[in-house]
Amino acid sequence: MRKIIHVDCDCFYAAIEMRDDPRLAGRPMAVGGSAERRGVIATCNYEARAYGVRSAMSSRHALKLCPDLLIVKPRFEAYREASREIHSIFREYTDLIEPLSLDEAYLDVSDSQWYAGSATRIAEDIRRRVARTLHITVSAGVAPNKFLAKIASDWRKPNGLFVITPGEVEAFVAALPVARLHGVGKVTAEKLTRLGIETCLQLRDWSRLALVREFGSFGERLWGLARGIDERVVHNDSRRQSVSVENTYDTDLPDLASCLARLPELLESLNTRIERMDASYRPDKPFVKVKFHDFTQTTLEQAGAGRDLDSYRQLLGQAFARGGKPVRLLGVGVRLRDLRGAHEQMELFPPQ
């Protein structure tokens, strides 16, 4: 049985700012862009969350909810340095570390010899050491797989630890709302609700075949998650999955024509980034991201499509049609194929 830990720093950017400037502690504060430049909240402390302020919210709206909110500019180098220190602590317990962002990661400690192999005690020690060394708090979840470990880390936030043992998996998952399942977004959650499925126990009543008919290949995944099954391994290689560029506009783009007019400059920036990548990557599926004025958003990609302007125009037209509202942010990108992995696989069978 695997032993997976998911570690998630509590309001990481805000925590670093409060650590470095104690005057910020105890008052509602956030890290993000200015309201005057249509900035967005990257994260906020728990005092701000009490007013309803949330990540990805416009700074202007956040200030309406909390007029006393102090918004500070992000200092990414400080966050990266803190992240490096945290990961150096992780590496003392295992080499199997999968970073998800600067402030969270999966650890596979199945073969760790620390604390006689107790994942719970390892997680406790990591939390203590991060608090002592960096003076910030982290939450952790321990479970037999990644899906449950991530849910567990959120169960007792902030500054908490939650453990789901193998014997507790079935009952824990049965009561879990389907909206908490990995990969279930707003649209899928709404469809499940229309089908009368709100908990994993109800989801278990559906056969694998019936779920595949309703949700395509994702139905197979739903069938497994409803039973607490997640075979994904912890990858300790943080290779890039995509490259993209996006822009938030000072004034909403009112219609599709306005959005299409912005495509050439976005593609120029994207192609510049692609040219800087090393030869172990190959651009694959193109995608577009559209965030509407009400902060709803959609991402659309297409296998087999080209990376020319016409291909992105078609994708943008389809994505815009999903909302049909003024647009505040446009993004374009491309999924990446890792040629290094393909090369290594080929080398398993050298020429005779």
Language-model segment annotations:
Residues H6, R180, T188, T193-L329, ...:
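DNA-contacting surface of Y-family translesion DNA polymerases
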Residues M1-E214, E220, D338-R340, Q345-Q352:
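Gly/Gly-Pro- and Ser/Thr-rich, intrinsically disordered tail segments characteristic of DNA damage-repair
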